[in-house]
Design a protein with these regions (language model features):
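Acidic/histidine-rich catalytic cores and adjacent linkers
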Residues: 305-333, 349-367, 398-553
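Short, amphipathic alpha-helical "recognition" segments used to contact nucleic acids or chromatin
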Residues: 165-178
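Short, charged amphipathic recognition helices of the HTH superfamily
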Residues: 177-188
Length: 553
């Protein structure tokens, strides 16, 4: 192929330069294919070893990150984004509650005769007491011969079942707040003298939690009503060994967890409505979705014969579809259901409608709200996943990422002091940055994809109160991952619901600065001296004004 080729005869330098660029990109493509084939080969080898019964390849983690980009799997951008912060150590004495005071005296036998008393020097020492508080209640008992009835004094609230509210609240706090497993909790309780069965402990964590389920719904509704925007993310979990998706919906004052069988758009819609019964409506918005989804005109014309602008239950809508569109395929049927359900969600007034979601670019978030804001950090991970092999391409990628995060910093500054002039400048700067063309084809393709997301990435220019990233909900989703690692999933739908409810309480209490243990104890004991978290969300939301940009001028 190269017989007779003499590089010294090259006259057209520009064409030669273009040829070199193409060859370098070909090297990148071949390197990527080679790495993919290596990974596939290793997976197949591992499967062969498993079938043969031989030990699998040990998963040995390196002590230091690999310098080879092809084997790197850390896509974090924290180093690029991190800014040094001034560290000031503050006193914590004013935050410590003093439970008792003890005066320590000097042994007079060791003092000289000329000493003078100069007062006291105070030292605060924190400690904890972990011991039993077993009580023998002597309940008064009366008998009425005339009524043939016995009158017996009642146990205090929270002491039902021969265990007190302090113990019940501590078990819930250990399991859901500290991620302790049930066997470890049993070991700890038995070590301090509590006699309790495995089944009793499990029932405390799962059964008869209706009061907490009700409070969760109230907190969620308060969170949705307190802000027109919400953040969302999901993660994998298990129930009875079956795959499930757990969704985390949040903003700065609360977090709510919901588990569904799938992560499709209708499942997310159920989450946004707190699993209220689905309704369906065929209106202009629904037909707009159908057109966007590319549903055939024959299906659309048939749907236009159904009752318009009418809220239908799921049973009613499915019956109409079966009557008028019996041959409707599964994919088009799914699009029809999604379009009508989302339109009904937007049209109803009984439940708060989310106007903007902050999330990643997963397809299930789209069309659920009027606006969608994308996470800049998630978008940046796409660039971190590029694995250039050629040194020049590495330099091009690093140079572009420096500009990317510099622009991100400018957006952060805009959030603090938004002005129309800065908004216009940042819009132009976005166009300039993402019009960049390099000689690295994979990078150019990635830049073009980011440019296509301009509206969602620059949503912060319209609504400066929303975050530029989705880290808050991603961290909330990790709480489920940590719980999953401890318990390996739940074993019943009741257990899943209890986990979602109490993790909602854990995360929300932390955001509001409320003690999770004290709150659970307050509710179990029946004291109800602490305000509901829903009330706190409403109160603090008024102070933060989370929807300022949606309010009329």
């Amino acid at each position: 192929m190269l017989e007779g080729f003499d590089p010294t005869t090259i006259q057209d330098v520009e064409s030669a330069r273009q040829c070199v660029v193409r060859l370098l990109n070909l090297i990148e493509a071949l390197q990527a294919d080679n790495q993919a084939l290596r990974e596939t080969n290793q997976r197949l080898q591992d499967e062969i070893n498993r079938l043969k019964g031989t030990p699998p390849r040990p998963a040995v983690k390196a002590n230091a990150p690999s310098p080879d980009p092809a084997t790197r799997n850390d896509y974090s951008s924290e180093k690029e984004r991190q800014k040094p912060k001034a560290w000031n150590k503050s006193s914590k004495l004013d935050q410590i509650r003093i439970d008792r005071e003890e005066t320590l005296r000097v042994d007079p036998a060791g003092l000289p005769g000329d000493v003078q008393f100069k007062g006291y020097e105070e030292v605060v020492v924190q400690d904890i007491i972990l011991r039993t508080d077993n009580v023998r209640f002597r309940k008064e008992k009366y008998y009425s011969a005339s009524e043939q009835k016995t009158y017996l004094a009642s146990l205090p609230r929270g002491y039902e079942g021969e265990f007190g509210p302090g113990l019940k609240a501590l078990v819930i706090a250990w399991h859901f707040g500290a991620n302790m497993t049930e066997p470890k909790i049993l070991d700890q309780l038995r070590d301090v003298g509590i006699r309790i069965s495995d089944g009793q402990l499990s029932r405390w964590l799962i059964r008869d939690q209706e009061r907490f389920h009700g409070e969760k719904s109230a907190r969620y509704e308060a969170g949705l009503r307190s802000s027109p925007w919400q953040q969302i993310d999901d993660t994998a979990t298990w129930e009875k060994g079956q795959n499930r998706r757990c969704h985390a919906v949040c903003h700065p004052l609360y977090t709510a967890y919901f588990t569904t069988a799938t992560k499709e758009r209708l499942a997310v819609l159920d989450v946004l409505q707190d699993f209220r019964a689905r309704r369906y409506r065929l209106n202009a918005e629904a037909f707009g979705f159908l057109e966007m989804f590319g549903v055939s005109w024959r299906v659309v014309n048939a749907l236009k014969q159904l009752p318009p602008e009418t809220g239908l239950s799921e049973g009613e809508f499915l019956r109409l579809l079966n009557e008028h569109l019996p041959q409707l395929g599964p994919q088009q049927k799914s699009r029809v259901l999604e379009s009508a359900a989302v339109a009904a969600y937007h049209a109803q007034r009984e439940w708060p409608v989310v106007r903007l979601l902050v999330g990643d670019d997963a397809p299930q978030w789209k069309c659920l709200t009027a606006e969608l804001a994308l996470c800049w950090i998630h978008e940046g991970r796409h660039y971190k996943k590029l694995m250039p092999y050629v040194a020049h391409h590495v330099q091009l990628l690093e140079s572009f990422l420096d500009r990317y995060w510099a622009y991100y910093d400018q957006l952060l500054s805009y959030r603090e002091r938004p002005t129309p002039e800065e908004k216009a400048r940042l819009e132009k700067a976005f166009d300039t940055l993402f019009a960049t063309v390099t000689s690295y084809e994979a990078l150019d393709e990635r830049i073009a994809k980011t440019r296509a997301k301009k509206e969602s990435l620059l949503m912060v220019l319209e609504h400066p109160e929303i975050p530029l990233h989705n880290n808050r909900s991603e961290l909330d989703a990790r709480r489920i991952v940590r719980q999953r690692d401890v318990s390996f999933g739940t074993r019943s739908a009741e257990g899943t619901r209890a986990r979602d409810t109490f993790l909602t309480l854990v995360a929300t209490a932390k955001k509001l600065g409320v003690s999770f243990y004290q709150y659970v104890y307050d509710r179990i004991s029946g004291a109800h001296q602490m305000p509901s978290l829903a009330d706190l969300i409403r109160e603090k939301a008024n102070e933060l004004n989370l929807g300022a940009s949606w309010q009329p001028p």
